[in-house]
């Protein structure tokens, strides 16, 4: 049903957004109404991290039903989604060894478009999206797109410092940049936990997870962050940390008796991304993910204290 909304309602609007901005393909909107209008915001139109969602969701549909019917249903918009991604990356290319991603506000929204660049989640999701879009071309009997392969190869590596992945690189000299990195969404962990990992050092990510757990300003986080952290910890083989993340004692990790994920009293008394993140994390911790070596409950400690019962889950990408 969600992809039908993308296909039937949002795609014409997304095509116009890309065209208006001088890009090919479809630029999916971040904050929208049921009719795919862009919601008023000083942030939403500068976000990129929603762009590969269509590719991720289409891949989920193919995994559930790997058929020609599925390919024909979604291949066109997978292609056009990737066309924008490639065109945007080309606009960022300055001819160096690596292609940076610039001019966008990060999922970690305190990392603004004019403050930082090379945000880790966006870099990882861009690489994932273009890689999967190439698979779709091959499934459709097409040759790989050489431009996309060049971008995949040359996308900048995740920024790091002292063996810890960073929230981005400063656009200009900023004395308090490091302090700024420990607020808002811990998006750097999403680069490993939310999507299949590509070219990320698990040891460095483990150090990054430890730095987040000990230094983050939790009052600035949001309800879906805790599930994201748990999924990262699970992929790293840290089930105790995964549970700790789900149970972080902070206001925005509050669930009311009616199930709503309460955020603040003045706004967002319910927050469905928090519910979605919690449910996704629990399912992933039970069923695992592609390449996971443990057949059952990899996200829970093997200390004899957990007796899990579940059914109907599929492994996460």
Q: Which positions does each model-derived feature cover?
A:
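Short, solvent-exposed loop/turn and secondary-structure capping segments
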Residues: 1-2, 17-18, 88-91
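Active-site core of glycosidic bond-cleaving carbohydrate-active enzymes
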Residues: 1-12, 43, 47-64, 72, ...
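Active-site-adjacent "gating/activation" loops or surface patches in catalytic cores
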Residues: 9-52
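Acidic/His metal-coordination segments adjacent to aromatic residues that form catalytic metal sites
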Residues: 28-46, 101-119, 254-268
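Acidic/histidine-rich catalytic neighborhood
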Residues: 80-139
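A glycine-biased, small/acidic residue-tolerant capping/turn segment at secondary-structure junctions
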Residues: 93-103, 291-302
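Surface beta-strand/loop "capping" patches
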Residues: 296-317
């Amino acid at each position: 049903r969600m992809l039908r909304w993308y296909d039937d309602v949002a795609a014409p609007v997304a095509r116009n957004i890309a065209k208006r901005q001088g890009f090919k393909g479809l630029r999916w909107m971040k904050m929208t109404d049921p009719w795919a209008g862009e919601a008023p915001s000083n942030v939403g139109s500068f976000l990129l991290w929603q762009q590969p969602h269509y590719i991720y969701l289409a891949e989920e549909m193919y995994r559930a039903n790997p058929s020609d019917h599925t390919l024909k249903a979604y291949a066109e918009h997978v292609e056009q989604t990737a066309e924008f991604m490639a065109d945007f990356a080309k606009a960022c290319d300055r001819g160096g060894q690596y292609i940076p991603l610039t001019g966008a506000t990060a999922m970690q929204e305190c990392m603004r478009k004019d403050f930082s660049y090379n945000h880790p989640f966006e870099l990882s999701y861009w690489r994932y999206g273009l890689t999967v879009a190439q698979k779709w071309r091959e499934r459709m009997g097409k040759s790989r797109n050489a431009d996309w392969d060049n971008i995949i190869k040359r996308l900048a590596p995740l920024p790091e410092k002292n063996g810890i992945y960073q929230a981005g690189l400063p656009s200009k000299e900023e004395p308090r940049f490091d302090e700024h990195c420990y607020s808002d969404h811990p998006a750097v962990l999403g680069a490993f936990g939310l999507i299949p990992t590509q070219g990320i050092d698990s040891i460095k990510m483990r150090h990054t997870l430890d730095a987040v757990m000990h230094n983050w300003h939790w009052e600035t986080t949001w309800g879906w962050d805790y599930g994201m952290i748990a999924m990262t910890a699970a992929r790293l083989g840290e089930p105790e940390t995964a549970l700790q993340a789900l149970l972080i004692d902070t206001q925005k990790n509050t669930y009311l008796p009616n199930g709503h994920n309460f955020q603040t009293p003045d706004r967002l008394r319910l927050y469905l991304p928090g519910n979605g993140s919690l449910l996704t994390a629990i399912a992933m911790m039970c069923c695992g993910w592609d390449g996971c070596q443990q057949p059952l409950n990899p996200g829970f400690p093997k200390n004899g204290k957990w007796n899990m019962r579940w059914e109907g889950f599929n492994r996460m990408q």
